[in-house]
């Protein structure tokens, strides 16, 4: 079972109460690398992602450069919530094909759960350089370690994220690094429903790219 198929089954560990949240709107880039191992298959998954997060209007967008072993592809993933109903759009940019899926879960706010254990603050690189705060987050299916830059008592910016766990006899670990994070949205058209998805059809995804196992990553 591919790692990308496994992760869509994982339960989110994000709680309703939070220690801190990202700004309501931001953009940035994420670089991820992960490994998975099951009875029949093991592999390495790598992604480079341009992301946009809009917590004000309950929507996200991600342009994913994806590699799983020798297989590589490019996807656009848009999540939108309107009138309390969520929809996931995944476009295979090489094939020009769209998959859609209705979402029963609520919009996932990019927040550190209130029950996360604060590990402490430390510096990346030189002492007195870039200061971050680390959190240990324990869930039923996955665990995570997240480091953030604190902006104020309520807001933080993601720096690194590592998630790991086991499901259906498949072990996995994934790390995420955040770069070039800026507040605000420069071009809101990134959240538009992709033109490839204008037909109201729903398909079973051959390659699930759910992001719900993350804490702050998109």
Where on the chain are the PLM-derived regions?
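An acidic-aromatic
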Residues: 47-115, 164-172
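Gly/Pro-enriched, hydrophobic low-complexity segments
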Residues: 128-200
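Short, intrinsically disordered, charge-biased short linear motifs at domain edges
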Residues: 5-11, 98-100, 180-186
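Short, solvent-exposed coil/turn segments at beta-strand boundaries
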Residues: 25, 50-61, 77-87, 127-130, ...
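Sequence contexts marking disulfide-bonded cysteines in secreted/extracellular proteins
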Residues: 19-22, 97-101, 110-112, 155-159, ...
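N-terminal leader/targeting segments and the immediate start of mature chains
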Residues: 2-59, 69-70, 121-126, 190-218
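Secreted/processed peptides and extracellular or luminal domains of membrane proteins
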Residues: 17-18, 25-28, 59, 94, ...
């Amino acid at each position: 079972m591919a790692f990308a198929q496994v992760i869509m089954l994982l339960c989110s560990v994000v709680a309703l109460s939070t220690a801190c949240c990202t700004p309501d709107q931001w953009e940035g880039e994420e670089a991820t690398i992960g490994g998975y191992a099951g009875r029949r298959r093991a592999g390495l998954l790598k992604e480079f992602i341009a992301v946009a997060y809009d917590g004000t209007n309950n929507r996200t967008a991600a342009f994913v450069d994806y590699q799983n072993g020798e297989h590589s592809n490019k996807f656009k993933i848009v999540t939108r919530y309107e009138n309390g109903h969520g929809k996931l759009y995944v476009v295979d940019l090489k094939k020009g094909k769209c998959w859609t899926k209705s979402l029963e879960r609520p919009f996932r706010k990019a927040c550190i759960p209130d029950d996360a254990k604060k590990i402490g603050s430390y510096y990346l690189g030189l002492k007195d350089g870039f200061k971050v705060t680390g959190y240990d987050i324990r869930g039923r299916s996955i665990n995570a370690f997240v480091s953030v830059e604190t902006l104020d008592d309520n807001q933080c910016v993601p720096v690194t994220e590592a998630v790991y766990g086991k499901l259906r006899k498949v072990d996995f670990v994934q790390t995420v690094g955040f770069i070039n994070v800026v507040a605000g949205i420069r071009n809101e058209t990134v959240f538009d429903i992709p033109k490839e998805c204008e037909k109201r059809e729903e398909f079973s995804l051959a390659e699930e790219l759910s992001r719900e196992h993350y804490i702050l990553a998109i």
